[in-house]
Curated annotation (Swiss-Prot):
Activity regulation behaviour: Allosterically inhibited by cyclic di-GMP (c-di-GMP), which binds to Clp and abolishes its ability to bind its target gene promoter.
InterPro entries membership: cNMP-bd_dom, cNMP-bd_dom_sf, Env_Response_Regulators, HTH_CRP, RmlC-like_jellyroll, Tscrpt_reg_HTH_Crp-type_CS, WH-like_DNA-bd_sf, WH_DNA-bd_sf
PANTHER family: CRP FAMILY TRANSCRIPTIONAL REGULATORY PROTEIN, DNA-BINDING TRANSCRIPTIONAL DUAL REGULATOR CRP
SMART domains: cNMP, HTH_CRP
Expression induction or repression: Expression is induced by DSF signal, via the RpfC/RpfG two-component system.
Mutagenesis or variant effect for R195A: Decrease in DNA-binding
SUPFAM superfamilies in the record: cAMP-binding domain-like (SSF51206), Winged helix' DNA-binding domain (SSF46785)
Keyword Protein transport in annotation: no
Localization annotation: Cytoplasm
Binding site for a nucleoside 3',5'-cyclic phosphate: 18-139
Record-given protein name: CRP-like protein Clp
Originating species: Xanthomonas campestris pv. campestris (strain ATCC 33913 / DSM 3586 / NCPPB 528 / LMG 568 / P 25)
Recorded consequence of changing R166A: Almost no change in DNA-binding, but decrease in c-di-GMP-binding
């Protein structure tokens, strides 16, 4: 379909990421002991300096983990969706306060349980499920370490254009990405893209214009169609 001023796009949402290595029964038993809470879009669930004593599990929606500098600049460290744990480091490394921001990207439902309570349950009613839950958390930690290593390498060795191209391709694999007749449709603002790659909003906008002129994508507002990624 045309990408002009009157574009109408028929889209289908990609399948959500399945809960890593956890079966439905294990999830249900874990959730039975957790407090479920709903959060609006763009809500900070916790910020640096907040007490660190809770494990979160994303039931629905999408969240971002963000590092914040003293001058209020932000760098997005990762996006996490349904079936993923957040704040899991506290199960293994004792820390009194949070060091990053957990912010909702969409309306979310999160399950929350204190580390102390979960450790007690691992010795009692959740004892049979403890190996599976801990293994799932280990898988997620390993994946996030690989993602962080890749992001650090990009910051060190790639220019802004290459970082943005690779980040857009990463976003095309996220559950929120939608199929499009010419590739993949993403919803990401210049500000969000800048936070993902570590540059200014203005620089992100200039790079998108260049990539559009080169025929690699079409960008309008917060909508980006990345060509050739179906």
């Amino acid at each position: 379909m045309s990408l002009g001023n009157t574009t109408v796009v028929t889209t289908t949402v990609r399948n959500a990421t399945p809960s890593l290595t956890l079966d439905a029964g294990t999830i249900e038993r874990f959730l039975a002991h957790s407090h479920r809470r709903r959060y609006p879009t763009r809500t900070d669930v916790f910020r640096p300096g907040d007490p660190a004593g809770t494990l979160y599990y994303v039931i629905s929606g999408s969240v971002s983990i963000i590092a914040e500098e003293d001058d209020d600049r932000e760098l997005v460290l990762g996006y996490f969706g349904s079936g993923e744990f957040v704040g899991e480091m506290g199960l293994f490394i004792e820390s009194d306060t949070r060091e990053v921001i957990l912010r909702t990207r969409t309306q979310c439902e999160l399950a929350e349980i204190s580390y102390e309570r979960l450790q007690q349950l691992f010795q009692t009613s959740l004892s049979p499920d403890a190996p599976r839950i801990l293994y799932a958390i280990g898988v997620q930690l390993s994946k996030r370490l690989l993602d962080t290593t890749r992001k650090a390498s990009r910051l060190a060795f790639l220019d802004v254009t290459d970082r943005i191209v690779r980040t857009l391709h990463d976003l095309s694999k996220e559950p929120e990405a939608m199929s499009h007749p010419q590739g993949t449709q993403l919803r990401v603002s210049r500000q969000e893209l800048a936070r993902l790659v570590g540059c200014s909003r203005e620089m992100a906008g200039r790079v998108l214009k260049k990539l559009q002129a080169d025929g690699l994508l079409h960008a309008r507002g917060k909508t980006v169609v990345l060509y050739g990624t179906r």
